[in-house]
Amino acid sequence: MAGVNRSFSYSRGDDALLRDDEREISPLRSAEDGLYSTSYGDVSPLSAGVQAQNRPFDRGLVSVPEGQTLERHMTSTPGMDNLGPASVGGGISGIALGVANSHNRQSGVDAFRETDVPVRNLPAERDFNTTGSDNPYIPAPPDGDIYPSSEAVRYRDSYSSHTGLGAGAPFAEHSTPGTTPSQRSFFDSPYQGVDAGPYQRHSAYSSHDYPLVINPDDIADDGDDGFPVHPKGAADYRSNANVPGTGVAGAAAAGGFLGKFRALFKREEPSPFYDSDIGGGLGGAEKAQGGRHIIGGGSRKRGWIVGLILAAVIVAAIVGGAVGGILGHQEHDGDTSSSSSSSSSSGTGSGGSDKGDGLLDKDSDEIKALMNNKNLHKVFPGVDYTPWGVQYPLCLQYPPSQNNVTRDLAVLTQLTNTIRLYGTDCNQTEMVLEAIDRLQLTNMKLWLGVWIDTNTTTTDRQISQLYKIVENANDTSIFKGAIVGNEALYRAGSDVASAETNLIGYINDVKDHFKDKNIDLPVGTSDLGDNWNAQLVSAADFVMSNIHPFFGGVEIDDAASWTWTFWQTHDTPLTAGTNKQQIISEVGWPTGGGNDCGSDNKCQNDKQGAVAGIDELNQFLSEWVCQALDNGTEYFWFEAFDEPWKVQYNTPGQEWEDKWGLMDSARNLKPGVKIPDCGGKTIT
């Protein structure tokens, strides 16, 4: 959704410049070939004869010079699952220990600081090869000049979805750009040095290994983060974490006794077990094995005496440890039984589960609180949704949190009964299904999403995962359909014809597979409202159109009617005489960040054109939501939650990229936002 210098236009590219061999052409012509002139630039929603112009594009990724340094600033949003650098385990050691596994939403500026790409050289978010909420799979290219910069590409030609606008990269022939060692991006690294985090944008186009790769497990630790230093070459004692606590304590106490006994003979080597931190002592066990000087020199008689005493102490320690372990195990069983009984009688805590697995469910206090928001109303036919942290391959190191998805679903179920996803990577679909099950949302339905890319590896992986999800489902009635690609034609740039051929091929492949497996699900795609044509409609089982009045520079007083008129004149006629479903796949309004005056029109003041703000959002909601509910219009609202990381796409005067949510990233309804209750009427 949105991007740098985004506008609603049929003529210019994303840099707002015409090329030397181009001239401005408006597609809105009268019967006499005269050009329309409207208050919204080139766009007239009443003109049925509009024909979209081909969109220019520049190819490829750029790369970062290998000597480029990285700047690190990061904090965590209060109330989130993450631990920040101020907490024990923050920073690189925390990442090495998996602290980021439960990463929740970072604040916008800090999320941006985790990327090592200057804002001025970032492509717009809707570049074909960028990661956005509707593209959590393919990363943004870093700075460099191995490939042409997408900044040279022109303004977008139309409104968009929830990724930023930018140059379209090639879609033709399912090709993957080749690379040479000099073209390798630092983003391809699986660790990315000390700046790696769950919000970094990595390249998915190369599997090369780099000398800059840093394995956090290999970094020397000075212990100042509160965790004990694990010695090189030492056996990993962390696997013993599940040993009953009393048994471990008994063993540590025995080791401490041995250490004190040796001290009587003035031995200098440290005890292999004695430490105030049991974990640290265990971790250092093998350090003492490098030189076994427990008895040392002296008379043989004294050696025998010491040996006999030590043998007796060791036997006593073994017996004591065994007894302690048995008693501890019995006590542990008793505590577990008592805890289970208490849990079953009084419910679980805010972070607990009645299943005892640490995962939230409908009986968790936190979930009960989230599902009891009187300011939310189930009036949206559908909501676009991308779980947090599902960028591949980064999610392999920092998996998204099931509890975060469950929290999101607890909120979303108060807004809608239908959710749309954009891809299958990183188990996002499985986590949504798990959340639906844990919350027992029997009325919730899901539109499956598949991300289509020029990189055939990405596309094949996504489609393969789609097949697994559907075939492994106990009941496919929860699925409403499969959306193969989002705005693949727009991102194809001028090579739209080849892109359309490839896209139709993917759609047909999925349809054939479902037919062979006796799976009855509609298959189609979603794209800009003016990118649909008869050929694509013929291949798809439904038509999904992304329509955003904000980027047309439409004033808020006209936004609702403009959206309806545009949809009715551009898209619904394509399915006349068929039973194919028509759906607006994205529509919304930002809550702040400036104003947009449409194609080729620079706003003269901050009140002109489409103004982002809470009041404007409320007006659009009040004039669109209940009316659509009454007339049965099918649409997906973009979007429920802010995405702070998209602050990197903001530009002066156009700072709305991270502000499209009804709620902030912590799932709090934004102050002043009023979701209509439509007189108590809800989506069925």
From Swiss-Prot:
Glycans are attached at residues 404, 427, 455, 474, 631. It is found in: Cell membrane. PANTHER family: GLUCAN 1,3-BETA-GLUCOSIDASE, GLUCAN ENDO-1,3-BETA-GLUCOSIDASE BTGC. This is Putative glucan endo-1,3-beta-glucosidase btgC. Residues 12-32 have a biased composition (Basic and acidic residues). Glucanases play a role in cell expansion during growth, in cell-cell fusion during mating, and in spore release during sporulation. This enzyme may be involved in beta-glucan degradation. Active on laminarin and lichenan. GO terms for biological process: cell wall organization; polysaccharide catabolic process. The chain crosses the membrane at residues 303-323. It catalyses: Hydrolysis of (1->3)-beta-D-glucosidic linkages in (1->3)-beta-D-glucans. InterPro entries: Beta-glucan_modifiers (IPR050732), Glycoside_hydrolase_SF (IPR017853). Residues 1-10 have a biased composition (Polar residues). It is an enzyme of class 3 (hydrolase). GO terms for cellular component: cell surface; extracellular region; fungal-type cell wall; plasma membrane. Keywords: Carbohydrate metabolism, Cell membrane, Cell wall biogenesis/degradation, Glycoprotein, Hydrolase, Membrane, Polysaccharide degradation, Signal-anchor, Transmembrane, Transmembrane helix. Residues 1-38, 124-143, 157-182, 330-358 are annotated as: Disordered. Residues 324-684 are extracellular. Its EC number is 3.2.1.39. Its main location: membrane. It is a single-pass type II membrane protein. GO terms for molecular function: glucan endo-1,3-beta-D-glucosidase activity. The active site is at residues 487, 586. The gene is btgC. Belongs to the glycosyl hydrolase 17 family. It comes from the Eukaryota. Residues 1-302 are cytoplasmic.
